[in-house]
Amino acid sequence: MNSFKYLKPKLFSVMKNYTKEQCLKDIISGLIVAVIALPLSIALAIASGVNPEQGLYTAIIAGFFISFLGGSRVQIGGPTAAFVVIIYGIIAEHGVAGLTVATLMAGGMLILMGLFHFGDLIKFIPKTITIGFTLGIAMGIVVGQIKDFLGLSMGAVPAEFVGKIVAYAHNIKSISYVTLAVGILAILIQVFWPKVSKKIPGSLIAILVTTFLVAIFKLPVKTIGDLYTIKAGLPSFTMPTISFSLVREMMLPAFTIAVLAAIESLLSAVVSDGMTGSKHKSNAELVAQGVGNFMSALFGGIPATGAIARTAANVKNGGRTPVAGMVHAFTLLLILLFLMPYASYIPMSCLAAILIIVGYNMSGWRTCMRMVKTAPNSDIAVLVITFLLTLFFDLVIAIEFGMVLAAFLFLKRMSDIAEVRQWTYKGSSDDDKLSEEVDLKYVPKNTIVYEIFGALFFGAANVFTNFEHGEGKNVLIIRMRNVPVMDISGLEVLEEILETCQKRGLTLILSHVNEQPYHVMGKAGFIEKIGRENLCVNIDASLERAEKLGETQKA
């Protein structure tokens, strides 16, 4: 039962001290965030290859459950730009039915991640990988909008990055300059509107202005209504047809959705923690994300996760409890019921412009450039490779390869800093220098002392075989206070050293063995082999033990 307290939604704990004043702030913030989410939800749905209302279904259903069950006070859930390229690719290959099954499976995976406390493992994904795949996704989003932004007369846009570029190049002569002008106007409005008001999103103003201009002047610009039939009304429950072959086929896409949802939602939660001074429950958040995606799929939605920009807007506008996220969902529901038909007049180039700005903002190119200038070459290599794999292949391959590469490079660095040092012995003429040698001890003449620095693991095991046993010595002390961890390869090195010492008539003494290496030795029976009396708590005890052995030998 104790472990399940980490899954308790934040809503249930914050409501104990809930006030009318905070309720009013949450309602106002929820309304503002809904206004921000409206154009984004529609634009992201269309860019993903589904109907506009499906973006709102996602923001309403997933957004509600992510707030209601989540481990963050202020998380706002819904469709995000990070999923656009992934969803588009899934639909192109497996259809909407495949996307629904993948989203259901991803929801189940996220719930299991939360139940098994995987939320704490996300922190082990290096920042270079998250920056790399985020930049790759952002680039894919921007490139995916070129058709609608330029008004190109062409068929369906290929899912692959290279295929998109080739298709655009073949159809570049069909550009519509009126459509381009509307798109540029939408971008300019989004760039400069924040100087007028930061409360009302520039994307909403861009939609209102461009829709008005296209309708009044009857401009030859394609609108949502030209391409989609928009449905107003409540989403209907639909149970997809599921077969074993389809489940097996959708396992990788589902895993991609689950991993990305977990990473983005927990990153958003961490950002909001920094803004509010609170602390989220990562495993409860994963369970909420799973339930949100599961329910979204059953009611015609698409994958969802925590949206960093909308969550930040929630905090800035006074939202401090999950009530704000729930108000945001109910507000979007009212818009869906009563205002959705008017969305058919929105120009496609305006939506493309909105997503181009979203892609630009999420790219984090400034952070990327700073890292390229300051980070080690190995980190830059991980970033660039992850970016390219995301762009030209897919997110799972990028993360898997990036993690393996980052792990190998880390092990290489750990191996490079590992070393063995033999203690230096000073003569009586060097007494004036003794005070500077903090670790300098009296060492019996029968003893030779080595000190190991670094992890004693397979990548550095060969470094620790360079021991000289010395002539006329009968005791070898290995000081291990700077060995934090050891694996089976490191243990085998110690066993080889012990075997060599026994053949040469030397006693091996280990000094200051840390907890983890001691546990490995005990489990493998090495402590019995070396003798418990030859494992000493510190170097002083080791030297004292060596001196006694020397006296015994003389006697």
Report residues per predicted region:
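Transmembrane helical cores of multi-pass ion-transport proteins
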Residues: M1-S429, F526
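Short, contiguous clusters of charged residues that form electrostatic/catalytic patches at enzyme active sites
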Residues: S29, I187, V191, N462, ...
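Conserved SAM-binding loop
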Residues: I76, L510, L535
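Short secondary-structure boundary/hinge segments and terminal tails
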Residues: V291, L332, H519, N538-I539
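Short Gly/Ser/Thr- and Asp/Glu-enriched loop/turn motifs at secondary-structure junctions
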Residues: I308-A309, E515, R532
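The feature marks cytosolic C-terminal regulatory regions of anion transporters and related permeases
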Residues: N361-K529, E547, K554
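Short acidic-hydrophobic, aromatic-tinged amphipathic segments that line or gate anion-handling sites
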Residues: K529-R545
